[in-house]
């Protein structure tokens, strides 16, 4: 009863709750989750990240919070605080070391998730971003049934056909839970090469499969060419097919790999860079969908 009341209190203290899902692993879902949280924090919002990936928690490393320990006071768990003041809760904080596996059966894992929801002292938040393991199993089901007033799900995919197939399952899954789909994000969508040449010089670069990409340098000699590493547009076409919003595309950026390893997210290290700008646009699209639902009473499916 006490935990149930606490969950209801969370519903009042946290204005917006956004679930971030992907049907397939390896699409950069945790990178997107942390990026969304940091982009929101850059805009002045109070933000938290709830890492629900019990067996493979990566969010603390990406947020520069490795080896941190959670503070417990009067039976309440206090989140760690990362870049830009973002609060973080994760199973990683409870492990003896990063090599310790979590070998739990379903009921124990689900109990931990409910504890993360009901026993954490988040304080007042504008946004809680909830990061899940890949797939449509117990974790998102438990959160959807336990956490009140969820604004909706963000589905992360990459342009490959296999990832798109699984993202379609995530959309259908959200409909079965009656949780709105805020939209689809296409990650790793094109790799932009920037360079310097003679002013107005014509540039030709060979991309994957030998495809030629042509552009012309500007009056200062700067040029940009975007290569389709994994092709582009699959996320948008899937969103259109299912009648859900397309929130935007995020570029393939090797800096995310370095940032994830170093614990300094690309948005923090280059707040004016192309990736940070792309995340800001996606965040605005998410806020727009939430605002439309609140002001017009629309049901987003």
Predicted segments with their positions:
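Short, amphipathic alpha-helical "lid/cap" segments that border enzyme active or binding sites
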Residues: 272-287
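C-terminal boundary of histidine-terminating zinc-finger modules
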Residues: 262-275
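Walker A/P-loop phosphate-binding motif and the immediately C-terminal alpha-helix
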Residues: 16-53, 171
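Phosphate-binding loop that captures ATP/GTP phosphates
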Residues: 40, 46-48, 52-99, 103, ...
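Conserved catalytic-core segment of NTP-binding enzymes
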Residues: 122, 127-244, 249, 257-258
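Residue-level signature of catalytic and energy-coupling elements of molecular machines
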Residues: 14, 25, 51, 59, ...
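Extreme N-terminal, non-catalytic leader segments
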Residues: 1-27, 68, 283, 290, ...
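Phosphate-binding/switch loop-helix module in NTP-utilizing enzymes
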Residues: 94-143
